[in-house]
Amino acid sequence: MDIDDTIELMQHTNRVEKTLKYGGGSYLDLFKGVNRRRTEIACMAWICQALSGWSLTSYAPYFFEQAGFDASSSFNLSVAGYGVGILGGIMSWTLLSFVGRRKLYLSGLLIPVILLLAGGIISVTLGSRRGADWALGAIIIAMTFFYDLTIGPVCYVLVAEIPSTRLRVKTVALARVTYNIAIMVNNIVMPKMLNPSAWNIGGKACFLYASTSFVCLIWCYFRLPETRKLTYLELDILFEKKAPTSKFKELQDRLDETAYLSMTRTEQLRSRWHGWLAYS
């Protein structure tokens, strides 16, 4: 990667966004024109992370105790969960280089749907029978691993890549606010679901987060684009053209065919809209 070319492309992207009047001075710009779609994706990516069921893993020690484990076993299982979470996070470094963000995000929502449905069914059918606690414990540990392998780290990549360069800071700030609101709801609801003196639904809480994960999965399938290997300029082109979600992966090939990426910096600057013609 040539650093000078990268900097020149960033400057070129900024000039293009100025030409398109993307704004950048007000939070209202986040909801104007094509920026509205980018704001939606950034906010929903973080909300999906909050609703994917990982709140169960954050309350793992308490969840394990309510599932029937003693305090010592609950602590040991929680430590095991954190261990596999670290392993998943390390493995995600490699996956992000070779697997698309969209695939990882969809996988990170589909797997919880399956695991949480299994957890809910086990809780209903087995109740407090021997073996049910270990099955739920294994599901929570698996949830921790797959969360840190997929949706956990990928969310931060998406939220940084989706916004326009001139509105990135404001978009990330707003997306984080929406995430915090979702987490506040989780922090209110989760203790009540597990507390024996409140709702006391125990493992049946898995059904709730299986439902929210499924809704998020449907949204991501239709609305979350693939951003891997796309520059900010290429993303600007796609969003400005109102490209369908399924078309984002095709832009790289189209630009290669028009030789735009092989042009020198001088040639690119003389042909500012060449990239647009590649996606017409």
Language-model segments: residues:
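Alpha-helical transmembrane bundle of multi-pass membrane proteins
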Residues: 8-280
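Short intracellular "coupling" helices and adjacent cytoplasmic loop segments at the cytosolic face
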Residues: 1-6
